Amino acid sequence: MLVRSLTEQVVGDLWPKDYLGEILAINAWVSERVRYLNDPMHVELLKDPQRLCEEILDKGFARGDCDDIAVLMATMALQVGRHAQFVVAGFGAPGSFSHVFARIQDPRSSQWIVCDPVAGSNVASMLKRITTYQIWSCDELPSHGPVETR
């Protein structure tokens, strides 16, 4: 599987059990190689992680929106045994969602690390502006619903 082999390359030079290093390496790799591109108006497109990785190998980069990036980030984290979640967020009225990002758990500290290349270096600022959110586990079937909602 292409996603697995690329993930192994990304984390391959790290010390064993450098879990935070793995998370940060995956975040940096995706940030450097996936460029944000909005979906067309009134259309929701989703590129699977395999396709994004193929584009990266073919062109050196891929294009995708926040959900494409979050799915790739979570898939790569799952490939190295990390727990991952999707945070579906809104910045306006309750229940009005406009963004999604991944967060990955560092098993050593149990802390969740926000991985959002779309926010770039402004992650803290973005998190402060969130007015509504749902957290979905990537480890469970979607039929269970969100694990947390505000």
Set out the residue ranges of the language-model regions.
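A structural boundary/capping signal
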Residues: M1-R150
